[in-house]
């Protein structure tokens, strides 16, 4: 996207200009991935110019408008500092989920390592699937589980396996445990298969998740 194209989207509806106008989160991420530091500066300019909001706006009709300022901040941090620039935001509970969203779209070994580092300190005992730890594990699942995923060394795959094993143990819900099983698809193959096959599962959802994970791991042999 060109600079003037983003500026035009920010200057028109349908959303109020303080909520980004017609700018979508995906626009900001693509823009900063394409334009780097210069793109980050432009995002910061638009955020200041239109006073992009920090908080959700909830309307009487039950709809809501998402805040654009946090996305602008994390995109700008990445544009100026790369993956390392997002580290302070990962450490900020108010910004972590936004930083995780950008890291997922960066799709690099460095972004995988940043997510693993975040998860290493995370508590997976929360039941909320939108919590930062769950979002980070879901991002790793997206980045590492499929044919066109990020290629990482075996040591990283082993770190992922240790992570999903801990997430499995801590998760209080079937949904959380199933996510851990799905994420094992990107782990070191032989060890992940042995672990999955050792689990005594009864819930239909988790049995199905294990089946999917084992199928993918066999494809990677």
Predicted regions and their residues:
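N-terminal leader/linker segments that initiate helical-solenoid repeat arrays
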Residues: 1-23
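Repeat-mediated protein-protein interaction surfaces in helical alpha-solenoids
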Residues: 6-10, 51-53, 80-85, 160-164
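Alpha-helical scaffold repeats of the Armadillo/HEAT/TPR superfamily
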Residues: 154-163, 198-202
